[in-house]
């Protein structure tokens, strides 16, 4: 997210890491013979007087004497880095045959851990330093005294690392028991590929303010219109918090999967929350559920607009009862994200939804509200202004003219046609199945690999990919995960299947609207379920894209979209559909009727109060349109 107002938000650089560490001394056979557990420790990368790359381990308190380990032949195990765990195996005194020391890192903020490991790998790749000196040289030479923290990664080091990548085969064949040479290997780590992300993630001033409040332990609700970077910021927040005690949830399974969490209902363990409070408390006292409540220190809730007020109040009361604390929400820090002007809570029958901000406990649980105002998804100011008006239920003659004009847009090319957003999921399934059958040729089926096949239905509900993906030549598809942001291969990127590999699994080759043709390989999704258990699914990051539902599109950015709003049934639904498009040129609206643009008057009042508290008003967004706009309030209210 480039911007002139970007600021870095990390409190310390990528050469330091604070986490839990277990130090294990291993026998020559690899068996642990001594273990020391440190609940809070600091790891630092640096060099000694001989310019050797070192790792310093510092524990607080009386046992805080620092220990330094040479990194000449370090091995990294990073399979669980995404959940804040990793292992570093260091040969004792840098000699592989002398037994090893193993550092088991846990409860690391995942983003901090990723960048720490990246820095370690890169420094070893570009500046391995001299090999281990002989015993005579060590006795006669100066004693390595000082530990100097290494400098942050420089652009020149990135270029040098990219120019010195070793072939993967050489890494795999390197014998572990060979005699160490006097010249340290250029890359001693058993990794498949050196990935060089661009600069450190940056946040805007608004986003950085939210992160600072979160890291101070403040309960907060941050909001903003579609495309203001709420999901981006939420992922950055989760990467900055220790996994232990942090529970990531969302109101829907798909939204929960995007942040690697679980649904709010699954975490709470009280079903729909319709039962009396005493019964809900009893349900929450079941062993697995109760422990989850007790362990929770920070509760993240995404897509809050779809959470009903009564359910929020019930959760707040259950939290206090189970945790036996009188503080709001049982003392849990709340990190809440969403836009109440988007999709409302789902209710049965003619019952009107009550939004979370109407909950009795809302104000005491969420004392701070911050609004993101800078739009990142769309760059066209005309389109941004149009979406702002639609978000507030305003549909002037000019807005109507612009949206009706999109009916003539040709939003696809090179065999890629627009995705139709539907108000009902049944229409999506029927459309995709019908269009796939109409294509000639053989069906290519790709089955997912689930970590627990017995819980596949849970993964179906929370993953954006299904157990089975069926494709044909010419199938319209959409990426459902970021693969290479700099190349345009992002979540929501549209493409068409142009072939299949002749070997192996016959992986699909997809031509994307951005002009890139890519063979799509299996990726992994991880979700958290009740009791803290993690489930994973491996599948191609694709879904059929002739049609998709408005609900499942929430939070996505789409290249080319076709919308029919004739069956819109909820406030905010038209706005969510329209705001999925990255540009006005990539949007086609069929049979537009300005009466479908409406929003809930209670939500308007909530945001008006919020802005007035900051010395702003909703009218100040666009005074020219405000004078002629029609206020389309939901007629059911």
Swiss-Prot record:
Pfam families: PH_LRR1, PIF1, Pif1_2B_dom. InterPro entries: DNA_helicase_pif1-like_DEAD, P-loop_NTPase, Pif1-like_2B_dom, PIF1_helicase, PIF1_RRM3_pfh1. It is found in: Nucleus; Mitochondrion. Residues 159-184, 618-637 are annotated as: Disordered. The modification Phosphoserine is found at residues 27, 151. It is an enzyme of class 5 (isomerase). One of its GO terms (molecular function) is ATP binding. Residues 1-180 are annotated as: PINT. ATP binds at residues 224-231. GO terms for biological process: DNA recombination; DNA repair; mitochondrial genome maintenance; negative regulation of telomere maintenance via telomerase; protein-DNA-RNA complex disassembly; telomere maintenance. Monomer. Interacts with telomerase. This is ATP-dependent DNA helicase PIF1. It comes from Rattus norvegicus. The gene is Pif1.
